[in-house]
């Protein structure tokens, strides 16, 4: 097959490309330039998609003996990922930009261009597994549960999965680093990228304020209605947040306060004790079924509401064009705007049943 290997400049995508070459595919490497000012993104080990990363990807491609190109996706990344991220926070929701990037950039824009150029598949360094059931590709958790990325891939369609390759799905991260060293890849010891790539200093509040400005509002006690303080914008908060609330007076019972809800129109941020954070019901919208199989009535499953952690047994069913999910135990810090992913536990790796965006919780 003709395979386009997306090479970020990290160890995972380099080894994934190497395995595609070793499997006998005709492989071409590509690095996506996602910023109009890539030289300003790096701060220490944070960030990604910088000029330095582009050079690392090119060096890896040279060692593998494959052609290498840099494609400019900065404008589309800004429109599809950054502007969506800012808009969601302005609306009081908590988006996952990595999920949006996979859906709109790596497996929509990139895959479209790859298909137009005659490639059969796109290969990435994601930790996830693909198998085939009844002729349909299905997405599963990776062998390395600590590195599993099926959550941020769960919005892909069956058609997109059918043109995708995840060569690292059955490997542990330690094995990937060892293999990179054995192949002579300089990125073998390169630190993993963390945080949001377009906010390299990790200060999401400052970034959002630079885009949205200050929109003052009140911090209100959810139980008493008492005004506890003021803030500069609901975009500086997320449900479940404890630190950085800017409340000087301690709670009467001495317990920590958490963000319970955000009201973007009035600018009110309601806070309270952890007792009020537990969620047992989720209403979700825009469901996606990667295996093309919509739920048939109430379905036992495991749900995940964050990229790492936040899982619970649940019963989910299709309702009013979306999903209605009842959790077997309460989950904390479940915020509108997050993705909820449904899994079916299986020995060969938990299977992704579907995903949707959280609209409301109770």
UniProtKB/Swiss-Prot annotation:
It is an enzyme of class 2 (transferase). This is tRNA-specific 2-thiouridylase MnmA. InterPro entries: MnmA-like, MnmA-like_C, MnmA-like_central, MnmA-like_central_sf, Rossmann-like_a/b/a_fold. The record marks 126, 338 as: Interaction with tRNA. Coiled coil: none annotated. It is found in: Cytoplasm. It catalyses: S-sulfanyl-L-cysteinyl-[protein] + uridine(34) in tRNA + AH2 + ATP = 2-thiouridine(34) in tRNA + L-cysteinyl-[protein] + A + AMP + diphosphate + H(+). Disulfide bonds join 101-197. The active site is at 101 (nucleophile), 197 (cysteine persulfide intermediate). Pfam families: tRNA_Me_trans (PF03054), tRNA_Me_trans_C (PF20258), tRNA_Me_trans_M (PF20259).
